[in-house]
Amino acid sequence: SESAAEKLARVRAAMQEKGAAHHLISSLDDIARLTNLRGNDVSYNPVFLAHLLIGASNATLYVDDSRLTAPAREALAAAGISVAPYEKAADDIARLSDSLLVDPAKVAASTLQSLKGTVPVIESVNPSTLFKSVKSPADVAHTREAMIEDGVALCHFFADFEARLARGEVLTELDIDRMLLEFRSQRPNFVSPSFGTIAGFNANAALPHYSCLLYTSDAADERCSVE
């Protein structure tokens, strides 16, 4: 897979093409992918709260320093990325004088407004966002592996689900949620679900993105909708 240093080199080449001296990235998925780091600050997403400011020869990750592990610090240092407190980002950005590349769709409106009139702003899609649209062989292989592992977990779940119903057990939507998590968590490299389980029966099955709670969980049969 591509190293963080190699990814930064591609971003800097794109910055040069656009005439940008600096590039601010606030979208968490872009930052995680560029740095090859993962976190759990947002439910169901392997991202962490941060800003990334990239220059022609330097880069700074604004993040809660206490959250970084020793291997993460070493990886950042190897890629030439320094670390600064998350709250320091606004001050450092305000001190910029050269052109700054930002994606207006992926930066806070307040940040964009504060830059107007203080620094030449180049508005364009984050280069890293475009890079993500082209999957590497490793990306494709890992996606296939994840789908296979999830398929195995689902096969185990459906077999257990049907066997329990055949024995006359009464299963609620909440039971199904717990069963799915149990089988998925047994697969290699499991981290977390990608979204909350949607297990709905009767009227609940008609609710988009329904999430069962203890007091709403209905008894289910083979007609239960599961996502």
Regions found by a protein language model. Give the residues of each.
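Terminal domain-start leader segments
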Residues: 1-173, 178, 185-192
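Internal maturation/activation junctions in enzymes
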Residues: 194-196
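Single conserved hydrophobic/aromatic residue that forms the stacking wall/gate
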Residues: 215-227
